[in-house]
Amino acid sequence: MPGTHTQGLVKKQTLTEAEANAIEQLITLCNYYEGLHMRLDVGVLRHGSGNETNDFLYYEDGILVGYLFVEGWGSRDRELTGMVHPDFRRRGIFRSLLTTAKEVCQQRNAQKLILVCEHFSQSGLAFVNALGAYHEYSEHEMVLGTFRERRNVYKGLHIRQANSSDLDAIVSVLATDSGNVESVNRWVAKLFEEPTSRFYLATLDQKPLGCLRLDFMSDQVGIYAFEVRLGYRGLGYGRQMLEEAIRAISAETQKRIMLDVETDNTNAIGLYLSCGFEIKTTYDYYGLIIS
């Protein structure tokens, strides 16, 4: 009917350009209102797979006032990031978004939701506490300032871009700590299909020693899944991997380079600081069992 406006909650598998633009505006508004750095890349949202319902939008008289994004590949956990327009809070909008997303995740046999809350977001913290969610861990987001490289080269260590034939080698590295080979395998296989994602494999005397993943986003490049096998840590291999990744990124783009690190991983934080990374903000992750 002419003149009608979208109202209430809308579930989407693929976003239109107008929807993505509205989400971007909402992110900017919420960030400004609380002085935050919302953990959502609109460039990624614009190119969603379209195979699953991961976007939940809430409208008031045609205006987007709430948004929730669900992410999770190959795992029983689903990571949720969302926001509500400052003028429309305390009206149950985010709870409605979360309830609907929870139902969709349960249909996919998810067992747990992980809610991402920036450490300094008073509204987010109040909400997760009201839900009864429990704190799982926290991460610093670190951004590269002035790159301080050493260019140490270790004999026998080779670092190269990986392809799908390296899937088993990468999984063997990433599953060292968790032991969940099947879940990691699904997750890595999915990431190999993503055009913005690129894995690198490090081998020592032709044996898999470590890996990392580059994620090329709209305004920055993230370094993720950075792992060195136990027994080879603290020997300089990780630093060489990180330096080569930074040089590869810098040769291709001038975008900002960032990475995440758990706040209690003091050794990794020390490495990143020594390479020129600086802490930008901190995110807290809260678990909510739904199975």
Model-predicted regions and their roles:
Residues 90-103, 130, 228, 234-251, ...:
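Conserved acetyl-CoA-binding loop-helix of GNAT-fold acetyltransferases
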Residues 28-31, 35-99, 103-105, 117, ...:
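Conserved donor-binding loop and adjoining core beta-sheet/short helix segment
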Residues 81-90, 226-234, 262:
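A short, internal acetyl-CoA/4′-phosphopantetheine-binding micro-motif in the GNAT/acyltransferase core
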Residues 182-248:
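Glycine/small-residue-rich hydrophobic helix-like segments
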Residues 1-5, 74, 86-155, 286-288:
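Acyl-donor-binding surface of acyltransferase catalytic domains
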Residues 1-42, 153-181:
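Short amphipathic alpha-helix that is part of the acyltransferase structural core
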Residues 114-125, 230, 258-269, 285-291:
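Conserved beta-strand-loop-alpha-helix junction that forms the acyl-donor binding cleft
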